[in-house]
Amino acid sequence: MPRLKTAHVNGLRALVHLGSLGFLLWLGYAVPAGLLGGDPVQGLTHYLGKGALHLLLLTLLVSPLAKRWRQGPLIKLRRPLGLWCAAWASLHFMVWLGLDLQFDWGLIGGELVKRSYIVVGMVALLLLLALGITSIPALLRRMGPAWQKLHNWIYGVALLVPIHYWWSVKSGWQEPLIYLVLACALLWPRREKLLRPWRKRPQVARRGAAQQPSRP
């Protein structure tokens, strides 16, 4: 396969922006036309949540495709996809907070206590926002190695979001399960990277024990 040039990558990035924005703008027609179902608030919440999940899976798909096709420049698509994922997830949260619960903080607190899937979703959103904010090149340079450690949490988000979706549905668990399987399939090639920190901990503990002076 011919190596992608800068113009090709820029074109793909433009498609990411146009597609992500276009599907949001479509809501300006879909909501008044009643295309989101009998409960438009619930329909809007699900639409934005599933859109964020799709963007998350696409973000995780970039690296395997770049490696498989030997197209390193494709990596440049991860940042716009990740930022749009965070944007869609934020809108999903704001619709739930503002339109569904109408900023009733007492009701919000009760929902957090009763519904664990909301807590899971909020943890995932906070991680996405942290990743989005620190994707600024200046912060990347200032954070150094800590930047990569933080951004490895995208893999945790990839599991939290399908679980949030699965726990939130009252019926029809098959679709969330498919998303969870897809997320696991995308994480499987990265298993060595994901398990490396856990394998280091016993080694560090043994090394520390070996360095302790023996008592007389």
PLM region descriptions:
Residues 1-216:
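Membrane-embedded alpha-helical bundles that constitute the cytochrome b-like, heme-associated redox core
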